[in-house]
Amino acid sequence: MNEPKIRFVQKKDLLQLVNLCKLHADYEKADYDVQQKEELLNKHLFSDHPSLYCLVVEKEGRLIGYTAYMKQFSTWDATNYIYMDCLFMTEESRGFGIGEKIMDKIKEEAQKLGCA
């Protein structure tokens, strides 16, 4: 079996990402309307100044997890920080330490974005 790969989401992944979001909502017992999600995610993830960043976990050509985060500014600390909106792994991919690897990758990306 191939090791899962953590990478930035690509436009070609948007349908799979929306499907993962639906699974995430089901897990949280929340409503999730898939209408226009691909279009809206495309707008916010792939603009010249993205308002959202997303890492996905790919295994054997299929997305098995994702995390979404944003660069924010703290008035109190007068510095930038990363706000992680969510982290979700499919049920069969949990328990293998992938979440910890995702957190390490977010820390790396936070430094690149000039966040504490």
Predicted regions and their residues:
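A short helix-loop-beta-strand connector motif used in the catalytic cores of GNAT acetyltransferases and
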Residues: L45-L55
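Conserved beta-strand in the GNAT
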Residues: V56, R62-K71, F88
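Conserved acetyl-CoA-binding loop-helix of GNAT-fold acetyltransferases
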Residues: G95-E108
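Conserved donor-binding loop and adjoining core beta-sheet/short helix segment
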Residues: T67-N80, D85
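A short, internal acetyl-CoA/4′-phosphopantetheine-binding micro-motif in the GNAT/acyltransferase core
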Residues: L87-R94
